[in-house]
Amino acid sequence: MALTQEAKNQIIKEYARHNGDTGSVEVQVAVLTADINELNNHMSENKHDFSSQRGLMKKIGHRRNLLRYLRDIDVARYRTLISKLGLRR
């Protein structure tokens, strides 16, 4: 259910701002989006898994806060990221 290390490394490589970057807002949002997508698939099959549902809501809230922060500090990076990830905003 969780992302494999290979998938996470691929996401980090794609969204990193420089070599060795694992903590930038873009990388964090991209990894959270992949986690959220996997949890959404899990929840569609397991509707009564309430602990996973709570984890999904926490991840969505964390991503929302990171996106709000990015929008406040740099609108161009924010718009690039949401278009690249295909998020509605």
Swiss-Prot record:
Organism: Oenococcus oeni (strain ATCC BAA-331 / PSU-1)
Gene3D superfamilies: 6.10.250.3130, S15/NS1, RNA-binding
A GO term, aspect molecular function: structural constituent of ribosome
Family statement drawn from the similarity comment of this UniProt entry: Belongs to the universal ribosomal protein uS15 family.
Oligomeric and partner information: Part of the 30S ribosomal subunit. Forms a bridge to the 50S subunit in the 70S ribosome, contacting the 23S rRNA.
A GO cellular component annotation in the UniProt record: cytosolic small ribosomal subunit
Claim: Cytoplasm is one of the keywords in the record: no
GO biological process, alphabetically ordered: translation
Family annotation (InterPro entries): Ribosomal_uS15, Ribosomal_uS15_bac-type, uS15_NS1_RNA-bd_sf
Function: One of the primary rRNA binding proteins, it binds directly to 16S rRNA where it helps nucleate assembly of the platform of the 30S subunit by binding and bridging several RNA helices of the 16S rRNA. Forms an intersubunit bridge (bridge B4) with the 23S rRNA of the 50S subunit in the ribosome.
Name of this chain's protein: Small ribosomal subunit protein uS15
Lineage top rank: taxon: Bacteria
Record keywords: Ribonucleoprotein, Ribosomal protein, RNA-binding, rRNA-binding
